[in-house]
Amino acid sequence: MSPPSDLPIAALSREQRLVFPSAADLNRALDLGVFYLKAPDDLNLASARQFGLELISQDSPFRDVPAYGELEGFIALENNQQTKLALRRERWDQHYPRDIAVFGRQLDAVGVAIMREVFHHSGIPEGLWDRASGGYTSGGGDAFLNFVHYDTRTPDWGLRPHTDYGFVTILDASAPGLQIEIDGQFEDVPVLPGHLVINFGEALNFITAHSERTVGAIVHRVLSQRSNDTVRHSIVYFANPNLDGTLWQFDANGEERGSSSVEDLFALLERNLTE
């Protein structure tokens, strides 16, 4: 499959604004719900990648991080090849090395900048951004920092086709395998050195649904990884609303247009991912 040659590329300005080469690139990114982002110069990717690579070793002490419910800890997904160390922001300082916790908070800043840019174009009044995002745009909400690798002993999908649950996903992947669905066809997303892949999720699509600029939630998958493939490991950051909160929809006049519990939306998406 050929790569999406027109996948937009953005960068963050000194003012933490998301900058695209043209309005057409911006609009395509918002429509598709996916784009490349130049990694900020101060983002310590090398250290984070090394940490993720070390998790592949069976004797890594971080494999002993306990499970917290179904979403956190050192866990494996059903019907997928993913094995991962997944932790919410509130547990980063407890379980991650200090430099990795700092790295996670750097991704917090990237996620907030992206969310604020989407809100700028949505027309939703700025005074409602915090409520619409469940507090995420002011440093609250929920966030996961996950280190993922793929168990080639199983013949399943690397990751089955799905959309993400939350607002924004930030991905750093070491090898090919990611594909996105455009016009009913899956296309490769090549690894672009020095860049992260950003995609939008269902919660962001939901809260912008009645605004001046609804954004897409991209369907994507990871191809089944084979034992002779380059070892694929990745860093994945999820910007989410509070998992026990409510999603609110506003229009450009600041009027409430609808709501849904986060729990209900995420439960539906979880069934789609694992069934």
Model segments located where?
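Catalytic core of Fe(II)/2-oxoglutarate
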Residues: 2-7, 173-275
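Conserved short histidine dyad/triad with adjacent acidic residue
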Residues: 148-161
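Conserved cytochrome P450 K-helix E-x-x-R motif and the immediately C-terminal K′/meander segment
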Residues: 151, 164-175
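Signature of the catalytic double-stranded beta-helix
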Residues: 88-133
